[in-house]
Regions:
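Short, surface-exposed alpha-helical segments at coil->helix boundaries
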Residues: 18, 22, 54-58, 108-112
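Short alpha-helix in the alpha/beta-hydrolase fold that links the catalytic acid
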Residues: 93, 107-116
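Catalytic active-site module of serine/aspartate enzymes centered on a nucleophile-bearing elbow/loop
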Residues: 119-149
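Core-facing hydrophobic residues within beta-strands of well-ordered domains
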Residues: 2-4, 118-121
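Short beta-strand/loop motif that positions the catalytic acidic residue
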Residues: 91, 97-99, 103
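Hydrophobic, aromatic-rich cap/lid helix
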Residues: 20, 38-39, 57-86
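Hydrophobic "lid"/C-terminal helical patch
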Residues: 40, 76-79, 114, 140, ...
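Flexible "cap/lid" loop of the alpha/beta hydrolase fold
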Residues: 1-37, 43-44
Length: 149
């Protein structure tokens, strides 16, 4: 195939329930990005990192705040409707799955389920929440470099 290696980081084959995404879409359409930006940042980083890593978090919070609400709602709809639980098993490419041990958005069980569905996967769990590449950049980079080497 055209893809020789695949890296799936802090993701899932299913991000249900749809009702949660519908509520998020309604909220952003009614009130804009401000309420979601803070809530997202709180979920995307561990408490310890949030307390010590404001320099890394501030630009991400600003980016969320500046995101077009309609565009964000569209992304939420795409995530709501995505269900790869049955088709993930069709992936036959060398795959690295990276997850965060403290990720409430895509918990470790989601990373493990992806790895099991795909088979022959290298699974790396980092001490991080949802943005493991920001919270653990060195460990994340090493995992990627080792996989691609």
């Amino acid at each position: 195939g055209r893809v020789r290696r695949l890296i799936l980081a802090n993701t899932s084959s299913f991000m249900g329930p749809p009702s949660a995404w519908d509520a998020r879409i309604a909220l952003v359409r009614e009130r804009g990005m401000a309420p979601l930006a803070q809530a997202s940042v709180e979920r995307w980083f561990t408490t310890a990192f949030a307390a010590a890593g404001q320099a890394a978090i501030a630009p991400i919070a600003a980016m969320l705040q500046a995101t077009d609400a309609q565009g964000y709602a569209g992304c939420c709809a795409a995530i709501r409707d995505m269900d790869m639980r049955r088709t993930a098993a069709l992936i036959d490419t060398l795959t690295l799955v990276i997850g965060g041990t403290q990720d409430p958005a895509t918990p470790p069980s989601h990373s493990e389920a992806l790895a099991q569905a795909i088979g022959g996967v290298r699974l790396v769990m980092l001490e991080a929440a949802h943005l493991a590449n920001v919270e653990q950049p060195d460990a994340f980079g090493r995992a990627v470099e080792d996989f691609l080497a």
